[in-house]
């Protein structure tokens, strides 16, 4: 049994850090363990121009603790009306991707895409300039059951999108289903996916055990056990199609514990420890470095990190709350035990 594990410094390819005092509170949590993070653009208002992305990047960099090597990788928010001309400016500014949110699918997605066909000229420009498309893979059709939204998205959006843009690099974000895992596994080399720690560790029972547990509520929502098992199999398979993306999504505790609670699990505080626990549960720690440190930068066409981190098999208690501007934030598994610790 391995009691210590040293891996190349990992990256987080799906992270929410918000803005202002909230940003200042959470960025250090990610910076202590990751070399880079792909930052989501769903602010209010959303990040839709290269100039906005550069300004946001500067604010994130300013929140990184001195002496810590952490670089935000920026994305734009794709809308029906985002002009193709903005793509060249984005590429020049170092923006790496655009995020497709179906309108109304998740937090701050009101300005999202209503019909993927409205964005085709912009997608053509992205394919030309080498920017990636990151998709929140759910339909928002009210006739589709909440737990089926990902599978229906594959049929209605992903398959036509891949047919029309075969060489556009697409990341299926935060996979939650067996259908999604198999789709990415069997797709062409321009398709990959991120998987969260909470979708590897928990199924939908976690939301309801002993009462409503709002800190396990996220979108896409946790699914049944068969899907969790399929995600673990994908993540630990060694396939370079799958890589780490926490989708860590901070919300003040009082807005999670609310009649209309916000969707999102805050995992950035303990992210790499939670992933280690998930991989250890199926005796696959030897596959963690590829998933966490290699597959993401390889797909994005970026160099791998040169530093390392070390994890130790040690049980410790996650803080119940952490400061979050004028509020508090409850991390996933707050007050409970995690069985690996970042040294």
From Swiss-Prot:
State the InterPro entries in the record: Amidohydro-rel, DHOdimr, Dihydroorotase_CS, Metal_Hydrolase
Which GO cellular component terms are attached?
cytosol
Binding site residues for substrate: 16-18, 42, 136, 219, 251, 263
**What top-tier enzyme class does this entry carry?**
hydrolase
Tell me how the cofactor is bound. Answer: Binds 2 Zn(2+) ions per subunit.
Which cofactor is essential here?
Answer: Zn(2+)
Q: Which GO terms describe its biological process?
A: 'de novo' pyrimidine nucleobase biosynthetic process; 'de novo' UMP biosynthetic process
Signal peptide residues on this chain, from the entry's feature table? none
Where along the chain is the active site annotated?
Answer: 247
At which positions is Zn(2+) 2 bound?
99, 136, 174
Q: How does it assemble?
A: Homodimer.
| Family matches, as HAMAP family | PyrC_classII
Q: What family is this protein classified in?
A: Belongs to the metallo-dependent hydrolases superfamily. DHOase family. Class II DHOase subfamily.
- The name under which this protein is listed is Dihydroorotase
């Amino acid at each position: 049994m391995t009691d210590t594990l040293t891996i190349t410094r990992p990256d987080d390819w799906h992270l929410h850090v918000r803005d202002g005092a909230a940003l200042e509170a959470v960025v250090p949590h990610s910076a202590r363990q990751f070399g880079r993070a792909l930052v989501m653009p769903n602010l209010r208002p959303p990040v839709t121009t290269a100039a906005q992305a550069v300004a946001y990047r500067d604010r994130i960099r300013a929140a990184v603790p001195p002496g810590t090597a952490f670089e935000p990788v920026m994305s734009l928010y794709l809308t029906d009306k985002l002009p193709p001309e903005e793509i060249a400016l984005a590429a020049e500014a170092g923006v790496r991707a655009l995020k497709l949110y179906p309108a109304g699918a998740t937090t701050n997605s009101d300005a999202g895409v209503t019909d993927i066909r409205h964005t085709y000229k912009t997608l053509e420009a992205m394919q030309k300039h080498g920017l990636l498309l990151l998709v929140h893979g759910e339909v928002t059709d009210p006739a589709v059951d909440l737990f089926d939204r990902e599978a229906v998205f594959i049929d209605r959006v992903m398959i036509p999108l891949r047919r029309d843009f075969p060489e556009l690099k697409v990341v299926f974000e935060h996979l939650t289903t067996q259908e999604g895992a198999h789709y990415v596994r069997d797709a062409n080399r321009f398709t990959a996916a991120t998987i969260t720690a909470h979708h590897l560790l928990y199924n939908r029972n976690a939301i309801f055990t002993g009462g409503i547990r709002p800190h396990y509520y996220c979108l896409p929502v946790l699914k049944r056990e068969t899907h969790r098992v399929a995600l673990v199999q994908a993540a630990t398979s060694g396939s370079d199609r799958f890589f780490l993306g926490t989708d860590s999504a901070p919300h003040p505790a009082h807005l999670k514990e609310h009649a209309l609670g916000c969707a999102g699990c805050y995992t950035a505080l303990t992210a790499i420890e939670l992933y280690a626990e998930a991989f250890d549960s199926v005796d696959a720690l030897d596959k963690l470095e590829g998933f966490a440190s290699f597959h993401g930068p390889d797909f994005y066409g970026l160099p791998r990190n040169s530093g390392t981190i070390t994890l130790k098999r040690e049980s410790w208690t996650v803080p119940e709350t952490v400061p979050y501007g004028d509020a508090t934030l409850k991390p996933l598994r707050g007050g409970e035990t995690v069985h690996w610790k970042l040294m």
